[in-house]
Amino acid sequence: MNATSSTPGAGAERLEQDWRTFARLLGQAYDDELHVPLLQLMLTPDEREALATRIRIIQALLAGDVSQRELKNELGTGIATITRGSNSLKSAPPELKRWLIQQLRDTPL
């Protein structure tokens, strides 16, 4: 048994700490212009593709001009993937949604 499984909540706390460490490291990598090699190191090609798909899903949902089913067909992904993106977007803070709209508005789908 590992240390995180013997203490309820400890695993979740560690996961959150590790996530924040990654976010801080990524921010520093951007400052140092090392973000692309860092992301290539940290993410497999499939994970990078999944992130790119999630961005396209969020962009299309924010634009609101296609249904989830149409988006599924356009992206060639499962409806569950579209639904997860939609649910994440629904729970995002309003300021993040505004920022995303501004950042993604001129990016082609």
From Swiss-Prot:
The keyword Transcription applies. SUPFAM superfamilies: TrpR-like. GO terms for biological process: negative regulation of DNA-templated transcription. One of its GO terms (cellular component) is cytoplasm. It holds the Pfam family Trp_repressor. Residues 68-91 bind DNA. The keyword Transcription applies. Keywords: Cytoplasm, DNA-binding, Repressor, Transcription, Transcription regulation. InterPro entries: Trp_repress, Trp_repress_bac, Trp_repressor/repl_initiator, TrpR-like_sf. Disulfide bonds: none annotated. One of its GO terms (molecular function) is sequence-specific DNA binding. It is found in: Cytoplasm. This protein is an aporepressor. When complexed with L-tryptophan it binds the operator region of the trp operon (5'-ACTAGT-'3') and prevents the initiation of transcription. The complex also regulates trp repressor biosynthesis by binding to its regulatory region. Homodimer. PANTHER family: TRP OPERON REPRESSOR. Belongs to the TrpR family. This is Trp operon repressor. It comes from Sodalis glossinidius (strain morsitans). The gene is trpR.
